[in-house]
């Protein structure tokens, strides 16, 4: 009879799921109210006109319209606006 002894154990073999962060709607794109524009950690992008910010810093549209990215201020922060 063929014999195979027990294999050793390993401490590897785990991996976390991707977080799927990033820009979901780009500049000039038409979107509806409630659509997610950016999923992010921290505020790389800041909410502007007609845009809201969730507790996990997700930027979303409040009204239907066109997405606009604008750099503003001394620190050149990127603000996202919706033009309707």
From Swiss-Prot:
Supply the Gene3D superfamilies for this chain.
Answer: 2.40.50.100
What protein name is recorded for this chain?
Large ribosomal subunit protein bL27
What protein family does this chain belong to?
Belongs to the bacterial ribosomal protein bL27 family.
GO BP field = translation
Please give the organism: Buchnera aphidicola subsp. Acyrthosiphon pisum (strain APS) (Acyrthosiphon pisum symbiotic bacterium)
| Domain of life, per lineage | Bacteria
Gene encoding this chain? rpmA
InterPro entries, alphabetically? Ribosomal_bL27
One GO term describing the cellular component: cytosolic large ribosomal subunit
What HAMAP family does the database record attribute to this sequence? Ribosomal_bL27
A GO molecular function term, named singly, is:
structural constituent of ribosome
Keywords, A to Z, come to: Ribonucleoprotein, Ribosomal protein
Q: Which SUPFAM superfamilies match?
A: Ribosomal L27 protein-like
């Amino acid at each position: 009879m063929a014999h195979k002894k027990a294999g050793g154990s390993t401490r590897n073999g785990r991996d976390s799921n991707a977080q799927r962060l990033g820009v979901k709607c780009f500049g000039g794109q038409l979107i509806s109210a409630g659509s997610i524009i950016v999923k992010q950690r921290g505020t790389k992008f800041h909410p502007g006109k007609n845009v809201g910010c969730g507790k996990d810093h997700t930027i979303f549209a409040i009204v239907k319209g066109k997405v606009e990215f604008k750099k503003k201020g001394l620190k050149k922060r990127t603000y996202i606006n919706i033009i309707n």
